[in-house]
């Protein structure tokens, strides 16, 4: 009791002395602190004030009270705040890219700027005028000083210092105080690099380190977690990272998928060992798919701790736990368990839980691990290699596209070039990636050929790390931004008829079935609008019954839609060009064209008093083995070029819908453009890995694609470089 009271009195006395020193110290002593290589926490309040309302002021220790617009300048904010922790950053991490301590020497500033600032003279203000700024300054300064004095922050600083020492020796140091030592098992081989004298981390290893450090700092420092972000930004050399990016490293789960033999487990060993030896009272969990995988990690961590600190501070139960004791009696512990012993981690209270080879652990073990997401001070780090040959051993790929950005995939091939790399047997990396290959692996065409000799596709599925596309795999081809523009931007064609071409194109994709769940007749009326295409009418027609009048019913739907378009745009078109697809039934296609011809001429004749109507033309085709042209269109090899042309125009904003779009079949409560957009969203591209042939389809999840095909083919017929014109009138019979 008396010891606790004495400690409290000493703390209060220290704070009073600190306050008296702050009031007496002068401005000259302030600059001396930084000149001698100190940090901004030694700089007292500089006697100046800013003429800004209090709500627009911000305080930067070592600088003073400024306008808060300075907070929105990342460069200024980063430079000013790095001075807060300058003396605490290990020498190995300060200015190591260029050599020397740039922060203390102010070498990051242009000489002209330094000279200009040195010539500035500020007007002194009365002491009573600067009282609010002085109080605000010391309030913020005391917060950072309390952070510096906290035991948790000291532990973090020691962790950073010791990790820098390990990094300097490429994790070969037998003691944290030494710089040399025998190489450890599977130690990374150093490669001579100009201007580089110590070990480096792979990018994914640095990200794992940042995830672990940021989360432990947030848990241990509590209220000071925000202030320590400045220190960690300086340590990890990310001064311009936004607050959103930093919060990403403090989330409570993350996943890393890394190719084989890239140093995943090798890096986790020193990270876990040093965390145990630096942070007091933490608990770490480590689990893998089998017990044989946890035993070497257990032995390596135990050997590291004993080599660094001696055997007296390390206790372990073989294969289960390792405890590291501190001089004050506190302990840090790591628990090992395999996925075959899920009860080994139940009931534990971890701060970090490493799941090694997570793609290969048992499903019931995954459920046990997920339970730790409910613990506020626990972070789960999944680290695994990939085997994309089986869905059961690549389930973590399902996290792609998650809003929290949980998944981090290390691969040498992007999604766009994956089919080409699969096709070319000598390629091992993507042409658009810079191959930063770890020095302790080999990966070339010979390795790929050898692996595939043992087992086909083993290189792509087991070694490369990316998810190889299976034959028949597909991907969407229309961009989200183009789809949103198609839905929102609809120009008026009734008021801008002068911008439209005089030709109108109609494509009919008939379906002769009464099953409304199967498919229907797609009808699209399209024209040119400047250099773009515009849709005037959309119809998705289903037959009530499959009878002999089906061609007449389909033709009547075409005529009703086309007549409304012509009525809305009087005199705008000189010709109407109709193409009726005849792949399913050529006889029915001819009947549809004949009915459309008859009905349209009757309607145009009744409106003859208003002037001559547009010329009615039909696409004519010569069937195989015949010598007579018939009014139908055979869709053969034109489909793929038509889809590719439409995708290019749609994604570049060259396809629009008229504001006065006509539809007599789509229900009133459904927007015809949205109805078409739903079908367009199902459009996928399938690439054959062996032949690199592209195929397109919209029949995904049982959805219909009739209207989409009609629109795409109508646009292709209207394209200047599309199908050669073969439109002729049907001879009228008396």
UniProtKB/Swiss-Prot annotation:
Q: Which Pfam families match?
A: DNA_pack_C, DNA_pack_N
Subunit description: Interacts with the terminase subunits TRM1 and TRM2. Interacts with portal protein.
Q: Which InterPro entries match?
A: DNA_pack_C (IPR003498), DNA_pack_C_sf (IPR038435), DNA_pack_N (IPR003499), HSV_TRM3 (IPR033663), P-loop_NTPase (IPR027417)
| Gene3D superfamilies according to UniProt | 3.30.420.320, P-loop containing nucleotide triphosphate hydrolases (3.40.50.300)
What broad class of enzyme is this?
hydrolase
Q: Where in the cell is it found?
A: Host nucleus
**Chain ranges for the short sequence motif Walker A motif as given in the UniProt record:** 258-265
Q: Which GO terms describe its biological process?
A: chromosome organization
- Report the function annotation for this chain: Component of the molecular motor that translocates viral genomic DNA in empty capsid during DNA packaging. Forms a tripartite terminase complex together with TRM1 and TRM2 in the host cytoplasm. Once the complex reaches the host nucleus, it interacts with the capsid portal vertex. This portal forms a ring in which genomic DNA is translocated into the capsid. TRM3 carries an RNase H-like nuclease activity that plays an important role for the cleavage of concatemeric viral DNA into unit length genomes.
Q: Where is this motif: Nuclear localization signal?
A: 183-189
Entry GO MF terms: DNA binding; hydrolase activity
UniProt KW keywords: DNA-binding, Host nucleus, Hydrolase, Viral genome packaging, Viral release from host cell
Instruction: State the name under which the record lists this protein.
Output: Tripartite terminase subunit 3
Where along the sequence does the record place the motif called Walker B motif?
352-357
